[in-house]
């Protein structure tokens, strides 16, 4: 019984050590005073919908799961009529060793850009680059 208690204690420390704080940031860098509509969801959570004013941003901190399968999908729409839109995977882990980091999305007139920041535990960090075009 004592060995089981020690095992459970060590196992729980490992589990708590792995659960990390990941972040999604969505910034409105559109021109012509356009607002940005956003809504994101995962298996367990729904973020939004929110209207992000020009120059503003939305930031959410969340824990990743132990199995390394945390995903967030987002839909962005350009104001004022919200005709131009894009739906995409805004966050995903690449393995159980990946801790997520900051996925920094920027909505611009010509598309949606991503910069992924992190430390040595972040898989595949990337500099700011265009990932998606707007759909009409």
UniProtKB/Swiss-Prot annotation:
Chief place where the protein resides: secreted
Pfam family, one: Self-incomp_S1
Keyword Ligase appears in the UniProt entry: no
UniProt-listed InterPro entries: Self-incomp_S1
Cellular localization per UniProt: Secreted
Signal peptide from the UniProt entry: 1-22
Annotated keywords: Secreted, Self-incompatibility, Signal, Translation regulation
Recorded superkingdom: Eukaryota
Keyword Acyltransferase listed: no
GO CC term, one of those recorded: extracellular region
BP-aspect Gene Ontology terms: regulation of translation; rejection of self pollen
Protein family membership: Belongs to the plant self-incompatibility (S1) protein family.
Protein name, entry field: S-protein homolog 17
Organism placement in taxonomy: Eukaryota, Viridiplantae, Streptophyta, Embryophyta, Tracheophyta
